[in-house]
Amino acid sequence: MKKSKTLVLGVNYKGVENYAKDYFKSIVDQDTDQFDLLILNDNTASLKLGEMNVNVDEIMISEDKSPALIRYDGLNYAISNNYQNLIFSDLDDFFSINRISLSIRELEKYDFVFNEIHLIDQNSEIIDENYLYKICLGKNVNSFYQILDYNCLGLTHTGINLESIKNFYIPENIIAVDWWLFTILLLNGANGKYIDNAITYYRQTDENLVGMKKILNENRLKTGIRVKQTHYDNIIKYCNQNNLEIALNSYALKKDGILELKLALKDLDFQKRYIDIINSNLDDLYCGWWSEILDLKTWRTYAN
């Protein structure tokens, strides 16, 4: 399939068919055609793409794989086919006409890139603009400390230079594969470039697993704790394997904080108060995916 040095990866899964038209229009409208497009069909029928101006390939995934392992398939495809760049995208989102060209340009100098986000609703109407800038990530990222407590680097607005991927793997039990990927890159000295003038229109729907700045409830709290505990467990294992002592200490403390929170939340009265305090202060404390899951020490600064 390969015709270009850059691969754009999208995943087609049940539920995105109502939005895929916007996605493919944004692909066709890009101000460059110097990329290939790979669509991974996750146990769903192939989409009717219509006339495309770039090289397109589709892979049907019939096995029952986690979202993490499906992304891993895409990453391995890009590496095995000797692509230089891999740009991530979601079929329920779309992006500005310059996103791919600017990503390609900056990936000549940086290990990864991430562009700005506008939040949109199910009807593609803008809810909030320049969201990364507003939640304080309107700058380059070059340290794991910047995404230690939460993540702002998702698989709808990022791209990586594949030369920065060395001996990479994705744990099968990982939930937040994006958080894992960029944490590992940063632990290995990667530098990420913020592109403020390219936009991903990030759709907020009821089906969206995470979304941005959603009200916390019991189910989302349990999911967030599971995400963080799994993330920290796997990063600690990685740090041990690679003798990353400074990072290991930081992540061990974060894991301890999550375990302490998990224990405290067994008291249902406290759980209700915890959720109420988070939601009352969401505008102030929210700064990315999973940032609303606060350890007890941080939570008390809002509760008092």
Model-derived features: where do they sit?
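Nucleotide-sugar donor-binding/catalytic module of glycosyltransferases
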Residues: 1-215, 220
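C-terminal subregions of glycosyltransferases and related glycan-biosynthesis enzymes
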Residues: 1, 15, 175, 180, ...
